[in-house]
Curated annotation (Swiss-Prot):
UniProt gene name: xseA
Organism name: Enterococcus faecalis (strain ATCC 700802 / V583)
Function: Bidirectionally degrades single-stranded DNA into large acid-insoluble oligonucleotides, which are then degraded further into small acid-soluble oligonucleotides.
The name this protein goes by in its record: Exodeoxyribonuclease 7 large subunit
Keywords per UniProt: Cytoplasm, Exonuclease, Hydrolase, Nuclease
Compartments it resides in: Cytoplasm
Any one biological process term the GO annotation gives: DNA catabolic process
Family recorded in the similarity comment: Belongs to the XseA family.
Length: 448
């Protein structure tokens, strides 16, 4: 019997007819993960669907792709409806997809990504965050009344900062009603206005379990709250939208409590250390001021007070001397002028000239008297002012405020090195003197 050999084309066409005629392959419901996806604008889409053990090529025509309500991405798990056929040019079978939608968890991830993008554009993630108070008095806890979360928070707060008051707002944290309950309790706690901090959260779980904390309404309630919020949802690797919107994110409930309150003993120790430093600073400042006072007290101003007004006394003497010299000079000048006038009058015999000269002489005498009086008054004012200035600088004024000076044998004592035990001293005050005997002498240490 002679064997009949088929061409590759003939075999491929035969197999294609088999594929197209099979009723089970005419409408296939398939689930898998998108692979090798490269988006092509305004064109047919070519990619693969795979699972853990197999892969199939997929084609989605432009008309079907434009009807999708989501954007397919690499690694997304989807459910598709289509037909299986053979592509003759390559001899491989493939699915022609007519409809596609995210599969289960994949849909949640898709919705989560879209919501993140939306809220991110609105600035809910990057907006200004509220600072947590350092010493909170009341803390609101929005979580389930049962479970490890509330126990961990209570234990941590009592251990670190037992003076803080925890107020639990029992809340559903899983299920269809959870998101509304979370929003309601956030708003209740925030409306009371007497909470310093708010902690919201729950334990770990699947994305479906954590989904209430990915709801848009929860994110907006957190963003609108005026109370600083710490979010602790799931495990450390779980990051929900609530975590991203909250003022602070904590990896665990224990970490949330640690962020909310300080360690009381450490704060008390810090306060004690600061008080000690303050006391030391005060004592150091007091010592500096005391030493400065002692240096001033021992300065020449108090030891030799007459030196304060030596210069002013000399200046006053010079001014007084110039005053008398000026008055004498003016008097002599006017006297000479008067004598000259008298001599001229004596030489003139007419009575009219004599009378006129007498009148002129009287006028000059009055003018001289006025000028001398005015000059004397001016000099007297200058003298009085100088005396007042000297009086302000007088050591008697200083002694009148409680200061004194000491003499030994009518000599001012300037230093303790001039004294010996049993010396007799005279202490001078503003209103009298006191006699004293030296018993002990204590020299001041030198300053370096």
């Amino acid at each position: 019997m002679t064997q009949q050999y088929l061409t590759v084309t003939a075999l491929t066409k035969y197999l294609k007819r088999k594929f197209d005629a099979d009723p089970y392959l005419g409408r296939v419901y398939l689930t898998g993960e998108i692979s090798n996806f490269r988006f092509r604008a305004n064109a047919h889409q070519y990619f693969s669907l795979k699972d853990d053990h197999a892969k199939i090529s997929a084609i989605m025509f432009k008309s079907a792709f434009q009807k999708l309500k989501f954007q397919p991405k690499e690694g997304m798990k989807v459910m598709v409806v289509g037909r299986i056929s053979l592509y003759e040019n390559s001899g491989s079978y493939q699915i022609y997809i007519e409809h596609m939608e995210p599969d289960g968890v994949g849909a949640l991830y898709q919705a989560l990504a879209e919501l993140r993008e939306k809220l991110g554009k609105e600035g809910l993630f990057e907006g200004p965050k509220q600072q947590l108070p350092r010493y909170p008095k009341r803390i609101a806890v929005v979580t389930s009344p049962s479970g490890a979360v509330i126990r961990d928070i209570i234990t941590t707060v009592k251990r670190r900062y037992p003076i803080a008051q925890l107020v639990l707002f029992p809340t559903l944290v899983q299920g269809e009603q959870a998101a509304d309950d979370i929003v309601r309790n956030i708003q209740r706690a925030d409306a009371q206005s007497d909470f310093d901090t708010m902690i919201i959260g729950r334990g770990g779980g699947s994305i479906e379990d954590l989904w209430p904390f990915n709801e848009e309404k929860v994110a907006r309630a957190i963003h609108a709250a005026t109370t600083p919020i710490i979010s602790s949802v799931g495990h450390e690797t779980d990051v929900t939208i609530a975590d991203m919107v909250a003022d602070v994110r904590a990896a665990t409930p224990t970490a949330a409590a640690e962020l909310a309150v300080p360690v009381l003993n450490e704060e008390l120790l810090r306060i004690s250390e600061r008080r000690s430093r303050l006391e030391q600073s005060f004592l150091y400042l007091l010592q500096q001021r005391t030493e400065r006072f002692q240096r001033l007290q021992n300065s020449y101003v108090f030891k030799q007070p007459e030196r304060l007004y030596e210069g002013q006394t000399i200046k006053l003497d010079r001014m007084t001397q110039r005053l008398f010299q000026a008055m004498t000079t003016i008097h002599h000048q006017k006297q000479r002028q008067a004598q000259g006038i008298i001599a001229q009058l004596q030489q003139q015999t007419p009575k009219g000239q004599l009378r006129e000269s007498q009148q002129q002489l009287a006028f000059l005498q009055r003018n001289l008297q006025t000028q001398m009086t005015q000059l004397f008054l001016n000099k007297q004012k200058q003298f009085t002012s100088a005396v007042q200035q000297l009086d302000l600088l007088s050591p008697l004024k200083i002694m009148g405020r409680g200061y004194s000076y000491t003499t030994k044998e009518d000599r001012v004592v300037k230093t303790v090195t001039e004294l010996q035990p049993a010396d007799q001293l005279t202490i001078h005050y503003a209103d009298g003197t006191v006699q004293a005997n030296v018993e002990t002498i204590t020299a001041k240490k030198e300053e370096f």
